[in-house]
Amino acid sequence: MSPQTETKASVGFKAGVKDYKLTYYTPDYETKDTDILAAFRVTPQPGVPPEEAGAAVAAESSTGTWTTVWTDGLTSLDRYKGRCYGLEPVAGEENQYIAYVAYPLDLFEEGSVTNMFTSIVGNVFGFKALRALRLEDLRIPPAYSKTFQGPPHGIQVERDKLNKYGRPLLGCTIKPKLGLSAKNYGRAVYECLRGGLDFTKDDENVNSQPFMRWRDRFLFCAEALYKAVAETGEIKGHYLNATAGTCEEMIKRAVFARELGVPIVMHDYLTGGFTANTSLAHYCRDNGLLLHIHXXXXXXXXXXKNHGMHFRVLAKALRMSGGDHVHAGTVVGKLEGERDITLGFVDLLRDDFIEKDRSRGIYFTQDWVSLPGVLPVASGGIHVWHMPALTEIFGDDSVLQFGGGTLGHPWGNAPGAVANRVAVEACVQARNEGRDLAREGNXIIREAS
């Protein structure tokens, strides 16, 4: 019997509310290699001690409930409880702490991102002892990450499939995102790919609306794709959005895409759901499709500074659930991103091993062992003059996506695509020759044009 069950049996069962910190705050706990570790930014209500707030998070996201229940005596809580093992005040913030919580591996179902999130962030966010709570980072132990398939193909396999090396890949979201007929939509796809882009993309809201049903769009885009491939001699792709109202319909669209022979499909991973995403990722690996992930609705969870969860947590979850590309902010352009922090989670997506580095927002050393990498996608308000900065920041293993930055070209879509391709090749060449992109960027672009 564990010490806990013993005391309970001998003293008799006492109901009533008790402080979480008596059971769940364990500052001398040594974390195990198999524990899932979480860093929460906790803002306790006035009068609630930080230890109690941290312990409350550990309790409510693992075995605890608001009172002592007699069924606690039927299990070994010491084996299954989450533990708040560290607290540190956040510099420059009043009454804000980083609480470190360790969860035993047995609390989680293998291969289920859905269950991991339900457990860790399922019901702690409405907790009344806390004014605000934000999940900043997770450490996923290899013992858990090995139960996931991960990205369908990963960076290296994708480059081999596309036969494109040594430069960032170029994409473009087809605009206007809603209202074009399938035929005109296909025409825009053809012009962009013909001009020199590697990919074009369905906007995340394009599913199957009255003005353009999914099957028509898939057909016309495939036609555009093959025409552009035949004329340029390069392998190209269009992210066909398979997101749908049911998982069955989503898989049906992915199957149709595979039958057309296209290389890549797309999914909105937050609105579609983790479960649907993992199913689609498995289908994609089994059938040789690349999978582009759009994180629509990310800002709902990730935008507030002290509540919700940081994007790097969603990025880690996505690498486990599966996706070959994921949108990751830009550092420049219209969507926000601080440079070091963005680079932090870009590395989490691409690299096998990432050292703890608080200046980049990385709270734990993360070892992905052999899980394939994900290509970060920079998109949102970027255009050709951002190219030197983007090449420097994101490096070769990335997809740079210009929507309005291609289609907004005064001469039309194809010249816009040409401009982007010329710019990226000029930047890569200049970088390889040892020139300073940050300083000479504009000059490099001018020379190229």
UniProtKB/Swiss-Prot annotation:
Modified residues (N6,N6,N6-trimethyllysine): K14
Binding site for substrate: N123, T173, K177, X295, H327, S379
Keywords linked to the UniProt accession: Acetylation, Calvin cycle, Carbon dioxide fixation, Chloroplast, Disulfide bond, Lyase, Magnesium, Metal-binding, Methylation, Monooxygenase, Oxidoreductase, Photorespiration, Photosynthesis, Plastid
The EC number(s) this enzyme carries: 4.1.1.39
InterPro entries in alphabetical order: RuBisCO, RuBisCo_large_chain_AS, RuBisCO_lsu_C, RuBisCO_lsu_C_sf, RuBisCO_lsu_fd_N, RuBisCO_lsu_N_sf, RuBisCO_lsuI
Gene Ontology molecular function: magnesium ion binding; monooxygenase activity; ribulose-bisphosphate carboxylase activity
Necessary cofactors: Mg(2+)
Record's comment on post-translational modification: The disulfide bond which can form in the large chain dimeric partners within the hexadecamer appears to be associated with oxidative stress and protein turnover.
Subcellular location field: Plastid, Chloroplast
Propeptide: 1-2
Annotated residues for binding of Mg(2+): K201, D203, E204
Main location: plastid
Reaction(s) catalysed by this chain's protein: 2 (2R)-3-phosphoglycerate + 2 H(+) = D-ribulose 1,5-bisphosphate + CO2 + H2O; D-ribulose 1,5-bisphosphate + O2 = 2-phosphoglycolate + (2R)-3-phosphoglycerate + 2 H(+)
A Gene Ontology cellular-component term: chloroplast
N-acetylproline carried by residues: P3
Site (Transition state stabilizer): K334
Single biological process term from Gene Ontology: reductive pentose-phosphate cycle
Note describing how the cofactor binds: Binds 1 Mg(2+) ion per subunit.
Function: RuBisCO catalyzes two reactions: the carboxylation of D-ribulose 1,5-bisphosphate, the primary event in carbon dioxide fixation, as well as the oxidative fragmentation of the pentose substrate in the photorespiration process. Both reactions occur simultaneously and in competition at the same active site.
Similarity comment text for this entry: Belongs to the RuBisCO large chain family. Type I subfamily.
Additional information: The basic functional RuBisCO is composed of a large chain homodimer in a 'head-to-tail' conformation. In form I RuBisCO this homodimer is arranged in a barrel-like tetramer with the small subunits forming a tetrameric 'cap' on each end of the 'barrel'.
Subunit annotation: Heterohexadecamer of 8 large chains and 8 small chains; disulfide-linked. The disulfide link is formed within the large subunit homodimers.
Database matches in NCBIfam families: PRK04208.1 (NF003252)
Protein's name according to its UniProt entry: Ribulose bisphosphate carboxylase large chain
Native species: Salacia pallescens
